[in-house]
Amino acid sequence: YLDQNIIDFLVKNRNSPFLSELKEDYQVNQSTKDLLLKYWGEKAEFRGLKVYRNPDIGNQVSEISQGLIVETIIKEYENSKRNEKTRDLFLTAPTGAGKSLLFQLPAFYVSQSGDITIVISPLIALMKDQVENLKAKGIEAIAIYAGMGKREIDILLDNCIYGNIKFLYLSPER
């Protein structure tokens, strides 16, 4: 089941560059590697992800580094801060492929500028787990999901505005 908004997005962006084309755009900077080591430990390494080269015309697969995807997200963030042209990056990957690193590492970079990262997740248990893991790394994170009261949500949002929250997890209905 695909939501019509997702279908519309895919149709609108069908001529966007595919992940397999990122290889030519950016190289992984040492500062990005340093962030990986800081938050994932001194033995951490970027893994390779298998992606379709061009899913519109076939199922040929190539491998791309998590680091290159992270670097691309960081560069797109920098482009947006300078009001330069940006592009979307769309990724689907199975459980265990390393998707959390793909948005968390750029978010650590973004947080150095005082900006916040908003993550939309339909799974409350996953959100709670992600928040707990981030807090264990010394990163301020909160989650807002169904079943929370208005006052509790207002307090959490105030913490985003006036506190030092770096990650805000939201369930789609919020």
Regions found by a protein language model. Give the residues of each.
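N-terminal helicase ATP-binding lobe
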Residues: Y1-R174
